[in-house]
């Protein structure tokens, strides 16, 4: 007996679907089947062949249609799925549904069929199949997604109630056909390898990933290029590898293959591709070694193993084995994900019911859905199960006495033949194919084990090869299912797919999906599968779908009246009327057809349930132990310890101070500090475990390298906005030019789903068209327009120009008014006499007029007038023939030698003229003035007729020499008289119109023609030159002025130390640790009073940059030495964004940073994002512009004393109370990129320049490269950086209008020096710069690409009377892009932002100057210069080609180029920057890249943005813009606002600036007396934890003369057993010192909390030298208000804020001696020494100490 059943189930469903009645009882033929199938096909219905078999007809087109029942997808039999499920749960019988394909073009129906099962299939299962499909399918000509596995199963485990408890996917033991899918794809078009390889190579791969995996074009891989097909079929309109690749990666991520696992998987796939290049016997040894080297790096294998231990066959076997192992591993991960989701759902359901799920193996059955894509295997399985009576259920029926009529011999022969083709897949071990398979498997195991043991231990490849180290290679054994065993142990249901035609999918008509029908094709499939015989056999005799033991049957149906024993069963069957084969009683079993079984089951379901009797067949389903009730564990209450919050503003609402929003209740989260709980610094765990989290998430350009989260289509609401007239005009213009491109083409072909993206593309297209048109116009005007005005000007030469061509390969001569290039002729031996053609013989004729050397025979060319061959003309010029042997006179009288060709009188016209015409270049021309001049001065008889020049000088000379003999006077007198009377003039009008004159014309043309009049001096030929000359002069003037502006010959000035307070803003994004450390160290080491500079770092989101192993904020905090245990609260603030993205959260850290003896306070703001962002890829990230806006907003509210957000209040508290400087004192903001290093004296120089000129609102210095020799791409940027500063910016600085203050190194004044009016922190600048509606192409380029340049533009717009300067003495260095891809990305941003910003600048009203002497003119010149860069490159290429092809040398163009680069060279030569000579040469070599490649790429990529989905522009019409906005808008109430004074009063904080009657703050004593207190007693309400790095490390005076007793300190960055290296909540409050601690107590990163005893502000002015130490820097706080507030003037940083008396006389003397010992006393001045001393002391001496300094300098000099 078979083991396909266990016992029957007593659990019945409340309903049943009931099967359809079988087909008519008549004989079934192929014709009837064909007709029935066609009818069902046209209606999209399945056809039930028998109770256990269904036929469906599907094509690629119908697989995407909706059926009449509303099902989307291919036609499938849902009832078959329900029947199989009902049988499994009611009969406790394992079932197997076999999905067969009768045609290789039939689409796969596995996923739709799984969805049709009446089971809650977990969604992750379909995701897993989506992840698995690319590994298993490939494009073929007959099927665009053909499965290349033998069998794939989805095995469900069910309870006896029919509920799912498990699901797993598995391949059969036959595995995958890797040879057909990868190793040996057909070498004909239309075939591809497995889809996964093309997904790997698609653009979905990030640049960093492509570089790491060395991914190339598909044609670079030997195994992929066999067919030459690399893209999906064109007949699939939605097929796109890039989109599919994104879905594929998302699916991998969903099933747990992400991070290191996904990188390992991709590395293996890339390695297999490269290993394919090493497969084959014709591979070159060098290519083989290179491929093995690459593969070794990707797979973690020693290349020598692949090269020497593996043969070619071994490498192919290795590819196949690794690929199958990889697929098995993916299936394993998929099954883990499915099991996890199922377990979670079971846990949820058990908790919801209060009862634990308790199932055993005996309580479950299985349904296995097996997909057999190969028609051969499906046919063999089906025919064997139906027609083979020797095994399976057929054999059971025969053994039980059921009459099973044998199949016909023809059918059996077909079955046997079908089985023989696939006997290996069916587990038949007797044939030769089985032995071959076993040999291949053994070989595969041998190779895999040989290579696998050489693989690195921790590599991904070893993980997939050795799934269990103790078991060795288990490929093909573990995780697979045996097809024969599954079929033999289950009740089998067949679902067969028919294809209606043999036509290829590309020939199907998409208009009518069901139109494809070929009776012949369908009939062939029916006959091959013997479906007519199948139906007749099953329907008439053995269509039984249920069978029972007799006792089992009685036990199940006794409630329906079934009697005991076999007789009782037979009687009951007769009573039911089941006598015509509906049920058959065998020897041991009862066999029941589907309709009879359903009838009995339905009656059983309707029968009232009776108390179950004790029966061996009944399960005690209700006897299970009751579940223990579960109680939800309440969440742990928030800590109220010292680290907990005490008074949270967000919870308190407006209890203390009325809310700005009118007392509206805040909707912000009540516990913002819960964000990023855990991990270092409270920023989450990303990057904390470096061993397992070393993957770079972002590269240097901020492009995401990891898996991308899917973009969810959130619900939106629609709003309308007004658009400007200019925008409406521009939109209309764009549509007028692009109307011919339908939107649906952009949507479906261009994959631009959103209207705003399509509109941006149209705008980009129009802009590119206009730019190209303008470039084309420029090129046309310069190159071609002159030729149109003056055609053939380059095809004429005068005598002087001909004489220039005297080279061996540039041999020009003129003969009888025509110019010839005989460079290819003169070297040939063209004389038939003894004269040899040598260089020395020919050189005298280069560039000469050879009229006299080729005299025309008069009798041939003037035959109407000369008949005597002896008549010849003599030359008036005696020097005309200097080499007589070169004269080519022809005729028997002239050449008596009959052997020479010149002997013939016809030589001139027959030989010479045809040959010389081959080298004709153009006409010889003469200026009219020259013709007239020679006629007057040289008595030359020549005239002009019809622009041609004829010369009779030799004619009259010969006539005179021959005494006027009539035979020599052969020309008509009417013509000769004109030459005598009007020499040198135009005689066209006087020319006789006679017959003789007409005859004489031929003679004149051949004998007396001298050329044409030079037309190049005419107005139409000269006007274009003069216009170009005018533009040239204008450009040269601009270049000259720029040169003079840059030519600063003065010595470098050394300004006195400045005392202004400066914020050094450092926005950090994805920079590496080395760059960040270098940048922070450079700011710390600036030669500027450390107390008056603040390093303000803003980390833009939790992002891991390329090459980093931790998020950027954690790297910054690591460098600054912040204690990782610090976890400040996440506080809300308003960011730049759309909708709810405007709400952001940030954390604030503060402290002191020490470097080389300089101790500088810092503030770090980390943008961490909302709670809902934490699962996204870049939580908190809003861009650099948002970082700048954050500090600008903060300083604006400080200036206006306006209400602040919680984050700004915390920043104010940290700066004001912890660091000890009133934020209102800061006057400048130095903006420095995180990877930029600033030279020590740069800040002082910038501040000094601003102090000397109060009109300066912004200033920048020179930026050079740190990595100039790193690669070719950095080398070509060195000179560009240098000259752009010293030429362009220096020139613009003359006008006080530098158009771009680079964000990497510039400084802005915060407010005016006179009246304190806000500048960069003004409302109008912030409002425009913080624009959220960045929804047009122009705004995107301004605000998303060029925010730094646009900020300068806004400053120029709103403060046109202020100056924006460049000073070359301030110097910084930054890292330039080192690869071409990064350079492309950077220049795309720069060039496009430059163009759009210059357009904005050109429209400003108040630019200085007028006409051509205005800044507007310079801006327009720069704009045009940027736009026509490609035209410039094309023109230079044209010049090079023109000169190389023998054209005239463009003297003016060369002079301009020489002038441009010569003047530039003077600049760096004067500055003694000799190295720039080499850099200039490299730059010139790269000019095509800068002037053509980069601009053209940039112009076309103007719309290349990340378009957010929170604000989608749906369209523009009229003066309205329709915008879809997220349903979750930004509510300002989510960010409560409060004034600092109100906040400080409510929290008992010092530093209030108003006249509040503040209560005396509490004092706390301790073991350190009144010098120490708990930090928790002195924090803002947000700093509910101990402030980051704000614990003091010493008592007052803890510098050189500090107290010997030191309290506990914050941990030093490198730990150790140094004193103070333990954590404490106690701090001692001392005055700030910028000197390092004593040895033994020194820490690189000091703490800041120099808090003091609190004093009432009204008494602070009386403190004197013993002033309050309630702040870090000891800055006295005036109690007066600023002009904005209403009392006295704003506190200025010119006051002496040092508090103590400063350095004593001994320190001053020591500094003087040190400085004098280091300087050249012969050249140094007293003023310079004084400046050096003050710089060394880090203090500005005034009063008595200044006088002491002067006296002591004199005394020390006297003593030397």
Curated annotation (Swiss-Prot):
Induction: Expressed during exponential growth. Residues 1702-1758 form the DEK-C domain. Pfam families: Chitin_synth_2, Cyt-b5, DEK_C, Myosin_head. One of its GO terms (molecular function) is chitin synthase activity. Disruption phenotype: Displays morphological abnormalities such as ballooning cells, intrahyphal hyphae and conidial scars. Leads to sensitivity to the chitin-binding reagent Calcofluor white (CFW). Glycans are attached at residues 157, 876, 996, 1392, 1557, 1645, 1650. It is an enzyme of class 2 (transferase). SUPFAM superfamilies: Cytochrome b5-like heme/steroid binding domain, DEK C-terminal domain, Nucleotide-diphospho-sugar transferases, P-loop containing nucleoside triphosphate hydrolases. The chain crosses the membrane at residues 729-749, 765-785, 1027-1047, 1417-1437, 1449-1469, 1477-1497. It comes from the Eukaryota. It is a multi-pass membrane protein. It is found in: Cell membrane. Residues 1670-1691 are annotated as: Disordered. It catalyses: [(1->4)-N-acetyl-beta-D-glucosaminyl](n) + UDP-N-acetyl-alpha-D-glucosamine = [(1->4)-N-acetyl-beta-D-glucosaminyl](n+1) + UDP + H(+). One of its GO terms (cellular component) is cell septum. Gene3D superfamilies: 1.10.10.820, Cytochrome b5-like heme/steroid binding domain, Homeodomain-like. Its EC number is 2.4.1.16. Polymerizes chitin, a structural polymer of the cell wall and septum, by transferring the sugar moiety of UDP-GlcNAc to the non-reducing end of the growing chitin polymer. Plays an important role in cell-wall formation during both hyphal growth and conidiation. Belongs to the chitin synthase family. Class V subfamily. This is Chitin synthase A.
